[in-house]
Amino acid sequence: MRIFYEEMKETLQSILVKNGFDEKRAEESAKNFADSSLDGVYSHGYQRFPRVIDYIHKGYIDVKAFPEKIAGFGAVERWDGHLGMGNLNAKMAMDRAVALAEQSGIGLVAMSN
C-alpha cells in the first residue's frame, strides 16, 4: 500500500486534533511523524503513532503540556517536559541546544518527563 506524504500528514494531524491537540501543535507533531516515515525511520513515524494515541488515552502523554526550563548554567540547561508529546519536546530541546551553541559555541539541553 502506498500513502502519499501529504495525505499521511493530514490524517495524522486530524487524529491528533481529535485527541485534544490544538491545530498548530498537531500539525508540527504530524509533520515530525510523517517526516520520520518519509526518511525511513518507521520506528518514529507511522509505526509509533497508534502507541502514541494509546498513551494519550491512558494519560501518559499530556496534550496540553509545554516544556519548562528548570535550571541552566551557561550553555547547559535542564528542562521538564511535563509528559508532553515526545517529538515536540525533542524538537524544542534540539532548537534550544542550537541557540545555545550559536551563543556559546556549544549547547546542551537535557529533558526529563
Regions found by a protein language model. Give the residues of each.
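A glycine-rich phosphate/pyrophosphate-binding beta-strand-loop-alpha-helix module
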Residues: K91-N113
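Generic N-terminal amphipathic, Lys/Arg-enriched alpha-helix
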Residues: M1-N19
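N-terminal and secondary-structure boundary signal
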Residues: V17-G20, D35-Y42
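Flexible, glycine/charged-enriched surface loops at secondary-structure junctions
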Residues: F21-E28, S43-G45
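Glycine-/proline-rich flexible loop or hinge segments
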Residues: Q13, S36, F73-L83, G105-L108
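Active-site cofactor/substrate anionic-group-binding motifs, chiefly glycine-
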Residues: Q47-V98
